[in-house]
């Protein structure tokens, strides 16, 4: 799994606004990625402070995502690359846990992001662009978040 991230830590609000796609555009974006030759699963998380694309594919899939993101946002490819953080494998999964747990949020610990992630997953699932790997990752994040809150509530 890969995660291509542009967030409040790497970009300004002008850049982030260009990457905050409405649902119609998200659907087309996901379709363009999913029907490319090198991506088997994908979802996009857009909030006011981040746009992240989680995807499964080979090494060439990274350039595909960067290119499609550049095309959809209208941000020059080389300019966009300045704002991107790329995570792969275990680091991508760890990043997903950190994002969902609010650790990567502007206000550390806020929990609205988990709901946004669940909606992004449901949107991708409804559009047929997620399968086993991303499903397992999002389910693990949701379960861990629930267990952490239950445990903390009982302290």
Language-model segments: which ranges?
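Conserved small/polar residues in nucleotide/adenosyl-binding loops
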Residues: 144-151
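Interdomain hinge/lid region at the active-site interface
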Residues: 140
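Short beta-strand
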Residues: 42-47
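Accessory, often N-terminal, substrate/partner-engagement and coupling regions
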Residues: 55-126
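Residues that scaffold, gate, or flank divalent-cation-dependent active/transport sites
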Residues: 37-40
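Short glycine-/aliphatic-rich beta-strand segments at the starts of folded cytosolic domains
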Residues: 1-22
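Short amphipathic alpha-helix segments
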Residues: 21-35
């Amino acid at each position: 799994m890969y995660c291509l991230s542009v967030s409040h830590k790497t970009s300004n609000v002008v850049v982030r606004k260009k990457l905050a796609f409405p649902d119609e555009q998200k659907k087309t974006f996901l379709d363009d990625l999913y029907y490319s030759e090198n991506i088997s699963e994908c979802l996009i998380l857009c909030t006011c402070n981040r746009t992240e694309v989680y995807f499964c594919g080979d090494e060439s899939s990274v350039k595909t995502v960067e290119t499609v993101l550049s095309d959809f946002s209208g941000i020059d490819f080389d300019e966009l690359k300045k704002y991107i953080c790329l995570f792969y494998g275990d680091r991508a999964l760890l990043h997903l846990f950190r994002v969902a747990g609010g650790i990567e949020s502007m206000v550390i610990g806020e929990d609205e992001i988990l709901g946004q992630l669940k909606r992004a997953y449901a949107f991708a699932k409804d559009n047929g662009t997620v399968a086993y790997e991303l499903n397992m990752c999002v389910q693990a994040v949701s379960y861990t978040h629930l267990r952490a809150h239950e445990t903390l509530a009982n302290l």
